[in-house]
Regions:
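Extracellular carbohydrate recognition and processing domains
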Residues: 162-197
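Extracellular beta-strand ligand-recognition surfaces/modules
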Residues: 25-26, 134, 187-214
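Surface-exposed, low-complexity/disordered Ser/Thr/Gly/Pro/Asn-rich loops and linkers
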Residues: 71-129, 142, 220
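Extracellular ligand-binding interfaces
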Residues: 129, 138-174
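Extracellular carbohydrate-recognition regions
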Residues: 20-84
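Extracellular beta-strand-rich recognition modules
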Residues: 54, 115-145, 200-210
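Bacterial Sec-dependent N-terminal signal peptides
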Residues: 1-25, 213
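Extracellular carbohydrate recognition
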Residues: 107-113, 144-148, 199, 210-223
């Protein structure tokens, strides 16, 4: 049985369809083709499917699926021919629309950091073909990331470091390319093949590295 997390999302690849379920993350079973719902557990985790195509709302990401305070923003009109009408954007502005750093001259560093809500993957295993997938676009109708400055878009998974602590592991990253047209839409799929990911409060996060002093170095994500 195959499952797929489509951006930013988890879903069953036997019924693979084009929806960003990590920007969706989309993971579903034949009997679960529905919106993700919270499970009443002590950790208050989400069940799969986990799906978000960013077409039903604008502004801050939905706190049912995403942790608050990320700085990432859902908008209509910033992507160029995206799969759905809404897209998730990353730049150098925080959740209040202010620069992360307005004191320095063109400061660089980690800007928006979007964490998924905890997802219960304990019922599944690496041999069940679970994956996270999404479409991404460099720039769109925003300001272009800078190849020379090492601007990048990064996906990380949360894994146990010790019995009581966790760490974030980079599982996918792309650096800005000056030769990539701003309307190019690319697809990413990250297979969950490590047993360390299959626990009851799995999380993934998406972050960007770029200029921290304004609405610069835009990256677009959709399902």
């Amino acid at each position: 049985m195959k499952y797929h997390i489509s951006l930013i999302f988890l879903f069953c690849s036997t019924l693979l369809f084009a929806q960003l379920e990590i920007s969706g993350l989309h993971l579903h079973r034949l009997s679960e083709v529905q919106n993700a719902k919270r499970i009443n557990q002590s950790t208050d985790t989400l069940a799969i499917p986990f799906f978000d195509d960013f077409s039903q709302y604008t502004g801050n990401p939905d706190t049912l699926r995403w942790e608050s305070g990320s700085g990432a923003f859902v908008s209509i009109g910033l992507g160029i021919f995206p799969p759905s009408k809404g897209v998730l954007s990353f730049d150098g502005l925080n959740e209040f629309g202010n620069p992360y750093d307005f004191r320095s001259n063109f400061p660089k560093g980690t800007a928006d950091v979007l964490n998924s809500a905890p997802i219960d993957l304990s019922p599944w295993a690496p041999n069940e073909d679970i994956s996270l997938s999404f479409f991404w676009q460099q720039t769109g109708l925003g300001e272009a990331p800078d190849q020379r400055q090492g601007d990048s878009l990064i996906v990380e998974f949360k894994i146990a470091d010790t019995d009581s602590t966790f760490k974030w592991e980079v599982v996918w990253a792309v650096e800005a390319s000056d030769s990539l047209p701003n309307d190019t839409l690319l697809f990413a799929q990250i297979n969950l093949e490590d047993v360390a990911y299959f626990y009851n409060s799995f999380q993934f996060r998406i972050r960007n590295r770029g200029t921290l002093s304004g609405n610069y170095d835009n990256w677009i994500i959709d399902y």
